[in-house]
Amino acid sequence: MEGYRLLYPMRTYLIVSGHGEETNVMAADWVTVVSFDPFIVGVAVAPKRTTHKLIKKYGEFVISVPSLDVLRDVWIAGTKKGPSKLKEMSVTLIPSKKVKVPSIEEALANIECRVIDARSYGDHTFFVGEVVGYTYKDYAFEKGKPNLKAKFLAHVSWSEFVTFSEKVHKAE
């Protein structure tokens, strides 16, 4: 077993990069909050990925939060290469509010980022993005917290995904 799998299951995201004819969508698990004030996030991307090239070229990306409803699109984004895969996907690209990179209409949330740092660590580059805007579906984030009924996706291994249960166990 590969050691990094000990950290799974992990939330799954769609990373949108580029714009116009160069728009690309990649599935990614390695996404994290770096700071909440200011709101800064990071994503690890392998240099061989089209997404890597486009983030470096344009200095922007969007983190889209998918639900179980777009699992087929997540699978395509994670297993196919290059912008041509968008023709196989059913998601709708819409203009973002603050960046040129489009957002995904069907996403539970779209987080718009401008790159403020990028460093290579092993076989990936960690892109750090300042969040300059975001949108979300009201039903997915009720009362300021995630509504688990929205079916947020988590990746278990290769083609296996789970959603979070509706039961919330409270620590006492």
UniProtKB/Swiss-Prot annotation:
It comes from the Archaea. Its cofactor is FMN. SUPFAM superfamilies: FMN-binding split barrel. The keyword DNA-binding does not apply. Keywords: Flavoprotein, FMN. The keyword Flavoprotein applies. GO terms for molecular function: FMN binding. InterPro entries: Flavin_Rdtase-like_dom (IPR002563), Flavoredoxin (IPR052174), Split_barrel_FMN-bd (IPR012349). It holds the Pfam family Flavin_Reduct. Transmembrane segments: none annotated. Signal peptide: none annotated. Belongs to the flavoredoxin family. This is Uncharacterized protein PH0856.
